[in-house]
Amino acid sequence: MNYSIRVKKREKVITMYIDDYKRWLGAELEDPALTDELKKIEGREGEIKERFAVALKFGTAGLRGILGAGSNRMNIYVVRQATQGLANWVKTQGGSRLVAISYDSRINSDVFARNAACVLAANGIHVRIYDALMPVPALSFATRYYKANAGIMITASHNPAKYNGFKAYGPDGCQMTDDAAAVVYAEIQKTDILTGAKMMAFEDGIAQGLIEYVGEDCKEALYSAIEACAVRPGICKTAGLKLVYSPLNGSGLVPVTRVLHDIGIDDITIVPEQQYPDGNFPTCPYPNPEIFEALRLGLELAEKTGADLMLATDPDADRVGIAIRCPDGSYELVSGNEVGVLLLDYICQGRMEKGTMPKRPVAVKSLVSTPLADIVAANYGVEMRSVLTGFKWIGDQIAKLEAAGEVDRFILGFEESYGYLAGPYVRDKDAIIGSMLICEMAAYYRSIGSSIKARLEAIYAKYGRYLNKVNSFEFPGLSGMDKMAKIMASLRKTPPVELGGYKVVKITDYQDTAQTGLPAANVLVYRLEGGATVIVRPSGTEPKIKTYFTTLGKTLAEAEAQEKVLADALKPILA
């Protein structure tokens, strides 16, 4: 291609997004904040390009982006366009022609949820929407409870405050399938972003019976379903557990404390600065229970009160992080992998003791989660299934068991990123049941003169000292995705033969479905001499490449030393 043609093509692209910008600027937008933002960036090509050169792409996880004006930002027009695309798909599905909606505490989450309801109602689709913020598991449950065609959760999970998102669920309460998402995306592309979505006033939708609030019967059924999954019912009532809990200014406060009170935990101190919904997340810019800074206030309060446990749930309350009190009075954070292994061990041990373990039990974990779980599962005679990253794949395994009439075989699903599910009542991770079972586990070990810490050390003593660490490399901006793609392509074209002096003995490329037997995924697994593994994959929701290290040593220090060597070896490759 000669220089003049390249210049003309670039000029055409610039003209397109500048034209889109001018169209938005000249429109009578319902949100004056969007108009103000557009005026401020007038003449600033880079700012305009970031907002209009591309559109947020709808996938199986829906949409997620920075709040603001333009097709590459989260705003009421992007939400309406996405909902119209979803509505077009729902109208082809038959059945109830109903969609369930929930939302978290993020900026404009309630506004986006109501806008989605208005679009659906205008399309003749019935809506069941929560009357107040409720978390991901509540949305998944309502979708199943009302036999809805789909569900919408307005959230950006644990992202910083400037983000929001639109998660779409299928009729089983699991994230939407690839095929369905592709159809919805095609319908979105046919819909003009400013004028293409049908709209009805929310009050008119209520008056016509098209929009209804989720009933108390559904809410109570959720709590009952969670509490029915207790391993040792009643164990918490006499344990005297002292708890500090933080909902991180998100949606977990009401459902988590309700269930904990129901099972007998009354001594719960809420972190006051993080108690109530606040989408600005003023005390933790990254409201992520994996990050120490998000837990800092909770840990400080735990030290003051002498709490046995500190729990924190992310804004949409599908993930929970914990800290445990050690014998010397200090607090230790427990990783998602460690909690997953502890819960697996506790559930197996308890259900065998109580005679409630199903025949041929099944547990499911993501392939990036610790291999220690496989060893623990085998010890109890549990089939451990490893699936691609993303809880929808765990939900898919539950659906397969359900289709075979064997859903009772499912005992636990978990991801290393602090997501747990111990029952088939929903199809996404659930911090409510995670919190309940963690507390129940602590109560049980106290009742036998032990502790979560002691049990974890006993597991390591029996199976080996596994260390699991996750690092992230961020690639912001429009060029970020291209950089990530080039890095992954380079790793495939020129695979490393060693990392940090450790020979690579096997490479598994999850894009090769014949090799893995799983759907294609952009994941590379390196197995090293001595048993360590390194996994590299781009995040599915954020502009970053994640690396997962699993090392095994006789001591923690030995495992940590190997992890550091491997992490240092990867840095220049992913820089």
Predicted feature descriptions by range:
Residues 3-15:
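Short, Lys/Arg-enriched N-terminal segments with co-localized hydrophobic residues
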Residues 21-116, 123, 206, 211-239, ...:
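An N-terminal, well-structured beta->alpha segment
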Residues 47-56, 164-302:
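Gly/Ser/Thr-enriched, mixed-charge loops and adjacent short helices
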Residues 52-72, 156-159, 243, 247-259, ...:
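Conserved phosphate/anionic-ligand binding catalytic regions in large, soluble enzymes, centered on
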Residues 100-163, 261-321:
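N-terminal small/polar loop signature for handling phosphorylated ligands or for N-terminal nucleophile
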Residues 111-120, 163-170, 256, 318-337, ...:
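Short Gly/Thr/Asp-enriched flexible loops that form oxyanion-binding sites at enzyme active sites
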Residues 169-199, 337-360, 365-376, 431:
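Glycine-rich phosphate-binding loop plus the immediately following alpha-helix
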Residues 303, 307-309, 330-332, 350-537, ...:
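Phosphate-binding and adjacent anionic-ligand microenvironments
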